[in-house]
UniProtKB/Swiss-Prot annotation:
Belongs to the MinC family. Keywords: Cell cycle, Cell division, Septation. PANTHER family: SEPTUM SITE-DETERMINING PROTEIN MINC (PTHR34108:SF1). InterPro entries: CAP/MinC_C, MinC, MinC_C_sf, MinC_N_1, Septum_form_inhib_MinC_C. Cell division inhibitor that blocks the formation of polar Z ring septums. Rapidly oscillates between the poles of the cell to destabilize FtsZ filaments that have formed before they mature into polar Z rings. Prevents FtsZ polymerization. It comes from the Bacteria. Interacts with MinD and FtsZ. This is Probable septum site-determining protein MinC.
């Protein structure tokens, strides 16, 4: 008796291929059907050809690192394919805890003085100042409702879309993820309106703009990235 429903559906997109994987069958059944489908000559390619990027749509299936390695071995064997992204409706408990930490915002009411280093998981709202010689780091974004005259490091664990905002932006240095910006003349950054620092991924550097301009700037960056 033949099985009517396919466990693997392959769709072409402008960016590559999307593999829709059934989340109700066993993982072994999934691997077997994927191996059978990819054995067709249509999917074979040489290393000299441009790689085909693959998005894996897992539905409500969770894969550990060992499962992903097995899946990647099937996809890449004998063909120039690269798994670019896994899209799953479920996550592990550890991933959920990490997302919770990054999403939460901690409010601090204090001054960060010279020589002090304060580290926060997630976003942080500081009601106070960061004095010269002080350092505030966060895995998320940093919002200073006061003067930022010391240093601030947002996206401490690599979050590149983190931001640093301050009511008075006059820092000695800013860092977002692994990108840094230092100031020789801090007075030139002092203005009456709140400013925000963020990563411009087009040129890979930190930009500082008025908070009111963030939406316009984001649209400009997206337009440049597409063109």
């Amino acid at each position: 008796m033949t099985r009517g429903k396919s466990f693997v559906t392959i769709k072409g997109t402008k960016d590559g291929l999307t593999f829709l994987l059934d989340d109700r069958c066993s993982f072994d059944e999934l691997i077997k059907e994927l191996t059978d489908k990819l054995s067709a000559n249509y999917y074979k390619s040489g290393e000299e050809e441009r790689p085909v990027y693959v998005k894996m749509d897992l539905g409500n299936r969770y894969l550990n690192e060992e499962d992903k390695a097995q899946l990647e071995a099937v996809v890449t064997e004998g063909r120039n394919m690269r798994i670019e992204h896994y899209d799953s409706g479920v996550i592990s408990w550890e991933e959920a805890q990490l997302m919770k930490e990054h999403a939460q915002t901690t409010t601090l009411t204090r001054m960060i003085r010279s020589g002090q280093v304060v580290h926060v998981k997630g976003n942080v709202l500081l009601v106070g100042d960061i004095n010269p010689g002080g350092l505030l780091t966060a895995t998320g974004s940093i919002y200073v409702m006061g003067a930022l005259k010391g240093r601030a490091h947002a996206g401490f664990e690599g979050k590149r879309d983190a931001r640093i905002c301050a009511a008075m932006m006059a820092p000695a240095g800013l860092q977002i993820a692994d990108e840094s910006l230092y100031f020789v003349d801090k007075d030139e950054a002092v203005e009456d309106h709140m400013k925000a620092a963020f990563l411009d991924e087009v040129n890979g550097s930190i930009r500082i703009e008025r908070v009111q301009r963030l939406l316009d700037v984001a649209a400009e960056i997206n337009k440049e990235a597409v063109s």
